[in-house]
From Swiss-Prot:
Cross-referenced Pfam families: FlgI
This protein's record includes keyword Signal: yes
UniProt GO cellular component terms: bacterial-type flagellum basal body, distal rod, P ring; outer membrane-bounded periplasmic space
Location, primary (coarse class): periplasm
Subcellular compartments: Periplasm; Bacterial flagellum basal body
Protein name: Flagellar P-ring protein
Amino acid sequence: MKLFFRFVTLVAVLAMSLANVAPAWALTSRIKDIASLQAGRDNQLIGYGLIVGLQGTGDGFRASPFTEQSMRAMLQNLGISTQGGQSNAKNTAAVMVTANLPPFASPGSRIDVTVSSLGDATSLRGGTLVMTSLSGADGQIYAVAQGAVIVSGFQAQGQAATVTEGVTTAGRVPGGAIIERELPSRFKDSVNLVLQLRNPDFSTAIRIADIVNGYASARFGGPVAEAKDSQEVVIQKPRAADLTRLMADVENLIVETDTPAKVVINERTGTIVIGSDVRVSPVAVSYGTLTVQVTETPQIIQPEPFSRGRTAVQPQTDIAAEQTGGRVAIIDGPDLRTLVAGLNNIGVKPDGIIAILQGIKSAGALQAELVLQ
């Protein structure tokens, strides 16, 4: 609990110190860091392949018959006869291969791929992905992947124990795919640029349009940008402008950003993230917990020697109840530092903080969006 409160306090102090020491740096960003070009989005690729060279950690052909079928088909394509008995070697694994095709990627360039086991393989460490075609949503092949697989986790197994750290059934092949086909792009023929904000906000969109118009008025003699909504800003191409150079100039412009106040809660991990703009109206909070502990300590009763009795187990149950908390605290958060200090004064665990924030939101005192994950 102390570690959690130290973490929350550290986040608060860091946010406040940045706001006091370097407000211009903390509140401004380049356009390229907060928005992306609509025509420059990634495209997902997928394929099915085999990983070979595993040290007995691959798929079992009984549990994963599709692995054997794929291996036989691959060998037949290589001109090798597959007639004969079934192999019991577990050095092959069937995997799904995924990758992201970046925008404006040209044939011959390389991209990273991710491999994930489909069968009952226990580890992909030490394996090699054999030639696998990667297709897009349109069914066209855009890249071919092959190479050594890198797995971050490891597994050690003995006769009576197994130690596993991380995920051993998924890995990456850095630069393992070569692009064979480029996506059709009409960027140079476009008449406008559409910027999409990664965090939609009307204030930020208006500021981007104003900054771009200021640059365009000085460079081309008139405004060219318009905020379409909270997420998109449309920039018309000036007649005498080169689109690539225009985008390079625009993406390096500095703009003041703005985001709505949010409190993000992950109930599974107990993580709480509080934005610097979160405010809490004066509210009284009381929090208490009732803990009931049930302990079973069965006793073994042995019979007297030569009495022909039987060993019996007599159950013994101890129940203890403890009620903690119950303090009443006044929380009034005009800034992040005061809000965190008020939560720390209550002295509850992270799950208690989550319940308190939900209660404050229900009472209408939390002036922020509460996001539950």
